[in-house]
Regions:
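N-terminal pre-domain/capping segments
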Residues: 1-100
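Short, intrinsically disordered, charge-balanced linker/junction segments flanking boundaries
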Residues: 105-110
Length: 110
């Protein structure tokens, strides 16, 4: 068993997230946002910067806290938006060794 947390609640930047995680004595982050963007929405250079910070830090990304199907999206929206997030998330999960992804449910229709 291990503890993990959504570290963007401690810091927006990845270095601060790593430090907060280590201060707790934990070694895993459920990564959601870095510098205000979801991991699957970061540009390639920013994502590689996250990977470099994680590599050798003693902390790993155990799960993606994705924006897939979240409350900010309408279930009637074009599904290609969601498909694009999935398509970007999978290779990034593989790169970081994350085995889990958290998805939400679309907002409730009025």
């Amino acid at each position: 068993m291990y503890l993990t947390g959504i570290a963007d609640e401690a810091s927006q930047d990845i270095e601060g997230q790593i430090n907060a995680t280590r201060e707790l004595g934990w070694n895993a982050i459920e990564s959601r946002f870095v510098n205000g963007k979801n991991l699957h929405d970061l540009d390639e250079e920013s994502f590689e910067s996250v990977c470099r910070a994680i590599d050798g830090s003693g902390v790993h990304i155990n799960a993606f806290g994705s924006a897939i199907g979240n409350w900010g999206k309408d279930v009637r929206d074009d599904f290609s938006i969601t498909q694009g997030e999935i398509d970007r998330a999978i290779p990034r999960m593989k790169r970081l060794g994350a085995k889990f992804i958290r998805i939400m449910s679309y907002k409730v229709l009025d």
